[in-house]
Amino acid sequence: MKIEAKFEAKNNKLYGIFSGQEISVDFNSAMPVADFCKVAGDFSAIKEKIPGSAEKVMAVVLPWEKVEPEPEAYDESFLAEFREVLKQAEETELFVVILPCAGENLAEKAEEFTAAMKHTARRIKDCSSVVGFAVPDALASLGFCEGQPAEFFVEELSCKHAHYVYFAKKAAVEKSTLLSEALQLPLVLY
């Protein structure tokens, strides 16, 4: 199932394709996935808190251990619940940027982490409420050049999800590349 893109990254900012408006996402107020799942079906209070445009976009923190509590053992019941809540968000036109996070030593486990997030993307592939994924700081700070963990993360998730937009902290990207190079990346910097 191919989902039509509703958002795009231009000049390192997020824009609605149909509205042409710049859209802000408050990553400082990102909601933990457990809390997001608890409010399923009643997103009106969340939407009211999101300022600005008609396109309401929020960030949801997704810990790696929620997806893969043990090595190579995905929590399919959690992923099914997460998908269901994202489908409910879709019905209310609430959009989500997934902010994956992991514990220490993420750079050493980048391939396993990326595999878990790719698995997550496959499980939520029909959720048009998903704008895209943020690249964790530990990966973004290593660079987006070919063969680097951040580039691998984006490439792996983009394979079957061309409509996703990717996000990264500006400070993390600046650590890895020249600012002029970072500004050329198809990323939304925050």
Show where each model-derived region lies.
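Short catalytic/ligand-binding loop motif for oxyanion handling, primarily in non-cytosolic enzymes
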Residues: 67-69, 104-108, 141-143, 174-176
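Aromatic-lined substrate-binding rim segments of carbohydrate-active enzymes
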Residues: 42-104, 150-161, 165
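Active-site-adjacent "subsite" loops/lids of carbohydrate-active enzymes
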Residues: 103-122
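Active-site region of glycoside hydrolase catalytic domains
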Residues: 118-190
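N-terminal carbohydrate-binding accessory modules
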Residues: 1-61, 155-156, 178-190
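Serine/threonine-rich low-complexity intrinsically disordered regions
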Residues: 26-28, 32-35, 39-42, 63, ...
